[in-house]
């Protein structure tokens, strides 16, 4: 019986480790999005300082291409909306992964107790 519990425990530990990896990836992704959000907010602020007489360029591959100020502002606004939506999605994903991780920890604790009880019950029989 202890061997069955031990195998189940190993499987649950692997699930928990995978959840921790997923959690780490999601946190890393969210941090990248936060950096992009900050960058784009700075660009938005800089574009707000310009008037119609200023010339704006965008980088397309290795080439700078002239862009209308209104178009540049709209592009940055859309990018900010997208990044904000992605951050919300990541936050939701992080909450789910944290909840699953907590449930997995509880399952592991229960299995460890079962395993210890099985080991204790097995030990007096051998003596």
Curated annotation (Swiss-Prot):
**Which Gene Ontology BP terms does the record give?**
chaperone-mediated protein complex assembly; negative regulation of amyloid fibril formation; protein folding
Give the GO molecular function terms: amyloid-beta binding; protein-folding chaperone binding; unfolded protein binding
Residues in cross-link Glycyl lysine isopeptide (Lys-Gly) (interchain with G-Cter in SUMO1): 66
Looking at the UniProt record for this protein, which Gene Ontology cellular component terms does it annotate, in alphabetical order? Answer: prefoldin complex; RPAP3/R2TP/prefoldin-like complex
Crosslink Glycyl lysine isopeptide (Lys-Gly) (interchain with G-Cter in SUMO2): position given as 66
The protein's matches in Pfam families, at most eight in alphabetical order, are given as:
Prefoldin_2
Residue positions, PTM N-acetylalanine = 2
Presence of keyword Chaperone: yes
State its role: Binds specifically to cytosolic chaperonin (c-CPN) and transfers target proteins to it. Binds to nascent polypeptide chain and promotes folding in an environment in which there are many competing pathways for nonnative proteins.
Share what the entry says about its subunit structure, partners included.
Heterohexamer of two PFD-alpha type and four PFD-beta type subunits. Component of the PAQosome complex which is responsible for the biogenesis of several protein complexes and which consists of R2TP complex members RUVBL1, RUVBL2, RPAP3 and PIH1D1, URI complex members PFDN2, PFDN6, PDRG1, UXT and URI1 as well as ASDURF, POLR2E and DNAAF10/WDR92.
The family classification in the record reads: Belongs to the prefoldin subunit beta family.
Please report the name of this protein according to its UniProt entry.
Prefoldin subunit 6
Tell me the organism: Mus musculus (Mouse)
